[in-house]
């Protein structure tokens, strides 16, 4: 570059830096306003996430961006990231306490990651929370004495044993609930162990979420739903969406959503390991979609093997779903071995028809995710 070009670039970059500084000040102002919104919501007991308000605001900003010659998707991307930050800030303000005469909440397994998250959310809502972990059972009678809610969040393999052996003497009006990722057996165990209100939850997210806004919590009703309705309202105030399900229906879905998915991810990682694949080389030649897939595989192996063993081995029925997947894999491999391109296309079209309108919807959603993956690449 010649001296004139260098000078012009430095001048323009200086102007851009100035605009960026203005953006920072505007962001700070917006976050301060969000904090005020959080305070008002806290006082009124309003949910942290208001989907209609969010959708209307995004539609309006997209329309305004179009008028100004700015790509609508650009402003939507920026605003969605801002809203995620806003939900985190609103959470820190705290939440309205729906049930102010509850007594204490006892979290069995509260020193675990998910137990810790619910401990934080309940305390932000003004509840007195006590933790009972594996070394605290000698204090159990004292801890349970004034309990209005006992929340079980222990490894799946010992959940039912803990319920049957340790939770049979709770106060009659105490709510017994669990956060286990399977529901049929824990629900049966809770209903047998406790004569009072019983409800089962499955949070469809990990403990590393910064906010419950837009997250899903599955609820399986057990007994005396009117006694724990306040708890559903409290979870909704945290921003989560409540999805009701029968335990058996939930567990059947989890065979595909969790057990088979995690198992196939495990096998894919195992195959990469046994093939002695060089991850740096794979990343160097990866497309955004493969980088995302590899990230999801790596994410699994960054977490607790005991947790995923619990999920995969929890249901005997999962073996059937995984076995069906393996059979379909073998059949598809036979197509490849035979060189039957025509039948491959026929089956591809059959699956595309089965997906229906979801296929283009998922294509749009994944396009945005892949663009985000590309943005994060540094080399």
UniProtKB/Swiss-Prot annotation:
Main location: cytoplasm
Alphabetically ordered keywords of this record: Amino-acid biosynthesis, Aromatic amino acid biosynthesis, Cytoplasm, Isomerase, Multifunctional enzyme, NAD, Oxidoreductase, Tyrosine biosynthesis
Pathway stated in the Swiss-Prot or TrEMBL entry: Amino-acid biosynthesis; L-tyrosine biosynthesis; (4-hydroxyphenyl)pyruvate from prephenate (NAD(+) route): step 1/1; Metabolic intermediate biosynthesis; prephenate biosynthesis; prephenate from chorismate: step 1/1
Family, as annotated: In the C-terminal section; belongs to the prephenate/arogenate dehydrogenase family.
GO molecular function: chorismate mutase activity; NAD+ binding; prephenate dehydrogenase (NAD+) activity; prephenate dehydrogenase (NADP+) activity
Residue span, Chorismate mutase domain: 3-94
Gene Ontology CC, one term: cytoplasm
SUPFAM superfamilies per the UniProt record, alphabetical: 6-phosphogluconate dehydrogenase C-terminal domain-like, Chorismate mutase II, NAD(P)-binding Rossmann-fold domains
Residue intervals of the Prephenate/arogenate dehydrogenase domain: 103-366
Protein name (database record): T-protein
One record GO biological process: chorismate metabolic process
Entry keyword annotation includes Acyltransferase: no
E.C. designation(s): 5.4.99.5, 1.3.1.12
Catalysed reaction equations from the record: chorismate = prephenate; prephenate + NAD(+) = 3-(4-hydroxyphenyl)pyruvate + CO2 + NADH
Source organism (scientific name): Shewanella oneidensis (strain ATCC 700550 / JCM 31522 / CIP 106686 / LMG 19005 / NCIMB 14063 / MR-1)
Localization of this protein: Cytoplasm
